[in-house]
Structures are given as C-alpha cells and as structure tokens.
Amino acid sequence: ARPTTDFAKENIFNVLNGYIDFEDAVALDLFSGTGSITLELLSRGCSQVISVELDRDHHRFIQECLNKLTKVEGQRSAVIPIRGDVFRFVKSCKQQFDFIFADPPYALKELPTIPDLIFEKNLLKEDGIFVFEHGKDYDFSQHPHFVEHRSYGSVNFSLFKSIV
C-alpha cells in the first residue's frame, strides 16, 4: 500500500477548493486503501461517500474507523464502504457523483484506462470533478476531459471535468 502523503493530500484539496464545494457533495473514493481520502471527504461535509476497496484488511480498517466515528458522533456515518473490485463496481454503478477520487496502485496495468472508464460510464455529474492519482510516467493532458495536472514530489494528480 502507498497512501497519499499528507502533504500531497493537503495541497490537492487546496486546489480543489477552486473547483468544488464539498458541503453536501456526493463523492466516490476508488481504491480507497486505508480510507484517508474517504475520511477527508467526510470531514469536508460530503453528504455521502462511497468507498470502494478490494483488500480485506484495508476494508476492515475503514469499517473500524467508521464504527469509532459513529460512537463519538452518535450517528451513522455518511460513508458506504464497499469491499470489491473497482472495475466491476464502476461498470455496474448507476449513480452519478459530484466528486470522484481514484488512487490505484501505480503498477496496475489497467491504470491508463480508468479516466475513459469513468466518463464512458457517465459517473460524473455536470460540473463534477474527477481526481486521478498516478505515477510520473503517465500523461493524461491529451484526454478530452483533462483540466490540469499537479505534482507533489512523486505524487501526481490529473484533474478531469465533464464536458457540457
């Protein structure tokens, strides 16, 4: 596992403030790992976050964090944790999102196909934003939905929007 660094996460969310108001947004966190982005989205006021992670231990960790939050706040979290294959989830998902974050393993051979898949399945609402974390060896600047690229050390983010 290679979690998004705190430095990179803080910086990308500062950039995102110019794109989206997270208050009451519906978000999707793909390849959610330990749930760091999921919890960040929750803390920023998202009304619902669907978190998709295949790894059993990571999924269990997210569940435990949510259970602790529920005990502290006295209400059920707005997070829906799903343990499953991200590609299978995306292909069958009928919901649209204001915000999508994907942080696949950098060595994943299907990594370059993910932006196309997100838009083919129409998962992003009008004016929604998709943030894709990837290694430095990838360049998505020619993608029709690409809006900008940010790099923080070895962590790279490509931002995409729906074309209206």
Question: In which residue ranges do the predicted regions lie?
Answer:
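Class I S-adenosyl-L-methionine-dependent methyltransferase catalytic core
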Residues: A1-V164
